[in-house]
Amino acid sequence: MSKDDSIEFEGSVSETLPNTTFRVKLENGHEIIAHISGRMRKNYIRILTGDRVKVEMTPYDLTKGRITYRMK
């Protein structure tokens, strides 16, 4: 799958789950499960409940995503 196929949304972290997984509430009202991207994991970027994040999703499964950016 190429990067062009992914869909980006913004949302806020509503709950922290085990294994660097988070429940994210998107701006359109949907709630998804998202994990941290490898680059964020490598650079030890911490994500807390309430943080605004950018989530990348595939059009094939709209219930899971990857957190690619934490807003300041």
From Swiss-Prot:
<dbReference type="GO" id="GO:0003743">
    <property type="term" value="F:translation initiation factor activity"/>
</dbReference>
<dbReference type="GO" id="GO:0019843">
    <property type="term" value="F:rRNA binding"/>
</dbReference>
<keyword id="KW-0694">RNA-binding</keyword>
<keyword id="KW-0648">Protein biosynthesis</keyword>
<comment type="subunit">
    <text>Component of the 30S ribosomal translation pre-initiation complex which assembles on the 30S ribosome in the order IF-2 and IF-3, IF-1 and N-formylmethionyl-tRNA(fMet); mRNA recruitment can occur at any time during PIC assembly.</text>
</comment>
<dbReference type="GO" id="GO:0043022">
    <property type="term" value="F:ribosome binding"/>
</dbReference>
<comment type="similarity">
    <text>Belongs to the IF-1 family.</text>
</comment>
<keyword id="KW-0963">Cytoplasm</keyword>
<keyword id="KW-0699">rRNA-binding</keyword>
<dbReference type="GO" id="GO:0005829">
    <property type="term" value="C:cytosol"/>
</dbReference>
<dbReference type="InterPro" id="IPR006196">
    <property type="entry name" value="RNA-binding_domain_S1_IF1"/>
</dbReference>
<protein>
    <recommendedName>
        <fullName>Translation initiation factor IF-1</fullName>
    </recommendedName>
</protein>
<dbReference type="InterPro" id="IPR004368">
    <property type="entry name" value="TIF_IF1"/>
</dbReference>
<comment type="function">
    <text>One of the essential components for the initiation of protein synthesis. Stabilizes the binding of IF-2 and IF-3 on the 30S subunit to which N-formylmethionyl-tRNA(fMet) subsequently binds. Helps modulate mRNA selection, yielding the 30S pre-initiation complex (PIC). Upon addition of the 50S ribosomal subunit IF-1, IF-2 and IF-3 are released leaving the mature 70S translation initiation complex.</text>
</comment>
<dbReference type="Pfam" id="PF01176">
    <property type="entry name" value="eIF-1a"/>
</dbReference>
<dbReference type="InterPro" id="IPR003029">
    <property type="entry name" value="S1_domain"/>
</dbReference>
<dbReference type="InterPro" id="IPR012340">
    <property type="entry name" value="NA-bd_OB-fold"/>
</dbReference>
<keyword id="KW-0396">Initiation factor</keyword>
<feature type="domain" description="S1-like">
    <location>
        <begin position="1"/>
        <end position="72"/>
    </location>
</feature>
